[in-house]
Amino acid sequence: MSEQNNAVLPKGVTQGEFNKAVQKFRALLGDDNVLVESDQLVPYNKIMMPVENAAHAPSAAVTATTVEQVQGVVKICNEHKIPIWTISTGRNFGYGSAAPVQRGQVILDLKKMNKIIKIDPEMCYALVEPGVTFGQMYDYIQENNLPVMLSFSAPSAIAGPVGNTMDRGVGYTPYGEHFMMQCGMEVVLANGDVYRTGMGGVPGSNTWQIFKWGYGPTLDGMFTQANYGICTKMGFWLMPKPPVFKPFEVIFEDEADIVEIVDALRPLRMSNTIPNSVVIASTLWEAGSAHLTRAQYTTEPGHTPDSVIKQMQKDTGMGAWNLYAALYGTQEQVDVNWKIVTDVFKKLGKGRIVTQEEAGDTQPFKYRAQLMSGVPNLQEFGLYNWRGGGGSMWFAPVSEARGSECKKQAAMAKRVLHKYGLDYVAEFIVAPRDMHHVIDVLYDRTNPEETKRADACFNELLDEFEKEGYAVYRVNTRFQDRVAQSYGPVKRKLEHAIKRAVDPNNILAPGRSGIDLNNDF
């Protein structure tokens, strides 16, 4: 069998050195867990970014099933200076999928490390391996009738909690800030040591998934969106399943209402009257997630005209902004908070409140209610069919939870997107003080001209938002080095100093978040 994927090699590695490493991978993992042929590597090179697949082609993929095997892979990589790109389930759609950040890196696939090690229904936590999916966890909870619920991103069933948390993804329940709910990591370092964060270093400790901090420096965050180690176990807290769950939607007809919506909502989030991550979705986000397509309304090139969007609102009952939230607790708690919430929106004098009883099984209400109650689904994949063609990049700047800021960001984004003939497909995810302004830059990747426009558009979005003091909190692998520049040279110098200390051979995902010892820092 050839040890070569069409001459795709790791940067700076000779064919001979690569072949030696592959032989050692085979001895360690078995032939079935070492993939080098082009057709075997296709699943690891399905990107949605505006570049050729070849730019992110792996040279090989290896699958580990134990921590000891991960340690062995790291040892081989150090011996032969082989860079590896680690994935858990590889479902990071819109952010790079499973493909490596740099051409030629070897994929370390942890999908076969898929044990649910423990779920404690009394202390409400889980400890899992990286290959565990949200769908797998949900099934386990249901089969064992456990009184806990999950929080996850959307679409959720095939993604996993470890990968999502390591990328600092968010969900839609009261536990929606996933990294905040993480408690205890096991990490294989570049030298092969196995490090446990928090209380995990104490022999016999039963508080590893209970108390986040441990003693001395708290290093969990150092391993997220970074390349300082390989997470092989993660603990996280689970929300006790409430006796009453009341989802609702508030539909607003006017795009200008965003200022009043956010300013009315913020006190409800700060006081925890509404405890979950609230969503305010644009019309086109609603349309895509309801599995409508642009072609049903217009075949004209360019962005979708406002007149067409207005017609869509009229036809479907969707708003210019569509707010989704939920109440949780005892019946008494929910009743009290429901009166507070409805009084706020009645005082606002705009917005039509829709309850679950009124919405029934209609989409997108149904899948939103599922997301807010910990039921995984794949409904939001419909966004990718809005325009079609397989192109998607998430542009995710952070804003204050202040109406004027949201209005400003929405206007900026629309202006740039429309300049390049693309649609504003967006949602705000509302925390007590901040908002994630998540925009899906959708384009036809089979159209070279449109792909070129999408690339220019994303660059301009980064530039224009940075001029106003905004930066994204997460980005696809094509733009990670560019976004790292937004945060200034001191941060980058420190990140590279840490990299030199913990990974002097630069084997762990060089280029992740712009951290690469080949950079001049």
Swiss-Prot record:
UniProt function note: Catalyzes the azurin dependent hydroxylation of the methyl group of 4-methylphenol to form 4-hydroxybenzaldehyde.
Species per Swiss-Prot/TrEMBL record: Pseudomonas putida
InterPro entries: Cytok_DH_C_sf, FAD-bd_oxidored_4_C, FAD-bd_PCMH, FAD-bd_PCMH-like_sf, FAD-bd_PCMH_sub1, FAD-bd_PCMH_sub2, FAD-linked_Oxase-like_C, Oxid_FAD_bind_N
EC number(s) stated in the UniProt entry for this protein: 1.17.9.1
Reaction(s) this enzyme catalyzes, per UniProt: 4-methylphenol + 4 oxidized [azurin] + H2O = 4 reduced [azurin] + 4-hydroxybenzaldehyde + 4 H(+)
FAD-binding PCMH-type domain sequence ranges: 54-268
Gene this chain is encoded by: pchF
O-8alpha-FAD tyrosine PTM positions: Y384
Gene3D superfamilies noted in UniProt: 3.30.465.10, FAD-linked oxidases, C-terminal domain, Uridine Diphospho-n-acetylenolpyruvylglucosamine Reductase, domain 2, Vanillyl-alcohol Oxidase, Chain A, domain 4
Gene Ontology molecular-function annotations: 4-cresol dehydrogenase (hydroxylating) activity; D-lactate dehydrogenase (cytochrome) activity; D-lactate dehydrogenase activity; FAD binding
Matching PROSITE patterns: FAD_PCMH
Cofactor: FAD
Assembly information from the UniProt record: Tetramer of two cytochrome subunits and two flavoprotein subunits.
Record note on cofactor: Binds 1 FAD covalently per subunit.
Top-level taxonomic group: Bacteria
UniProtKB keywords: FAD, Flavoprotein, Oxidoreductase, Plasmid
Protein name, entry field: 4-cresol dehydrogenase [hydroxylating] flavoprotein subunit
Biological process, per Gene Ontology: lactate catabolic process
Pathway: Aromatic compound metabolism; p-cresol degradation
